[in-house]
Amino acid sequence: MNRIAVLLLAFVLFSCESVNTKRVISTDNAPQAIGPYSQAIQVNNTLYLAGQIALDPITGQMVEDKIEVQTHRVMKNLGAVLSEAGFSFDDVVQSQVFLSDLNHYKPMNKIYAEYFNSEPPARAVVQTALPRDALVEIMMVAQKP
């Protein structure tokens, strides 16, 4: 009987450890999704942020057509979503940057760097067509210890 109790206890403990909790993150301080997706999804200690373009969260309109202005707006939008979930830019471990023109790389990079301390996340940058004629879109993954 003790053997069965020990096996049952072990099964229950291992089952609890493998449970993943999924939570949708949404904030009015960042633009609402313009399609069938969430601003972010948190699974346990990992936060997956959807790509953000330079939409003003209040008006829903694109900000000025300059890469520096758009990059700041995108990072502020991402910061609002991070904050809503209890994360910060210090928790970001990976990002993907999409540019409409690779000539925007240097000015985007300068603004992007302002949001990270000495240990920026891993990152990829690619050129692609973007919705609403955006100049930049950025998506991120953040991880809590």
Where are the predicted features?
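N-terminal presequence-like segments and the immediate start of the first folded domain
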Residues: I4-L8, C16-K76, A80-V93, F98-P145
